[in-house]
Amino acid sequence: MFFNKKNNQDELKKLAATEAAKSITTEITLGVGTGSTVGFLIEELVNYRDKIKTVVSSSEDSTRKLKALGFDVVDLNYAGEIDLYIDGADECNNHKELIKGGGAALTREKICVAAAKKFICIIDESKKVNTLGNFPLPIEVIPMARSYVARQIVKLGGQPVYREQTITDNGNVILDVYNLKIDNPLKLETELNQITGVVTNGIFALKPADTVIMATKDSNIVVL
């Protein structure tokens, strides 16, 4: 019997997403994130359609998927405050601080987190780490500032790599930063955001997850 790692990971992502959906309450304004784990959440939302008053999406990709299932997606400017925002992460530490942005939607995701009363992060066990930084840190950058920002990141000890053929939903570019050991996520998030030309970076420490729902390799759910 062959062990298919991808299929098993997909099952865990679906397990975490299904568990998170149980937090959906009646007349809720729901924020929906971006990425492969959220893809399973979107599929699960059809079972909660009667409870959802309004849906806000963090990316054009998620908006397309939601509309394909018959959901009306509302701009955050009209929705106001989000009751619950559910999203995945590329890494999560013991303090529920995250690295996000592998799908290049980090700025809109960070806006949704800021506007949400509660943020639930859904992950499989492979995303849990002691120290953030193994996954390259995405930074959204104004295009004309790309080289300047890259030079400033080098001064901080990082190795920036331009993510080619990627334009964010906001019309910007992504630098993925390698070789950063992020011992103080809060400090680095603030420091990077102060570089002129940076829109935002993928550290979520100023507003970490309120709750993390993690599916373990033995198909159990752990709530952090």
Curated annotation (Swiss-Prot):
TM region positions: none
One GO term of the biological process aspect: pentose-phosphate shunt, non-oxidative branch
One Pfam family from the record: Rib_5-P_isom_A
Keywords recorded for this protein, A-Z: Isomerase
GO molecular-function terms, A-Z: ribose-5-phosphate isomerase activity
Subunit record text: Homodimer.
PANTHER family reported in the protein's UniProt record: RIBOSE-5-PHOSPHATE ISOMERASE (PTHR11934:SF0)
Name of protein: Ribose-5-phosphate isomerase A
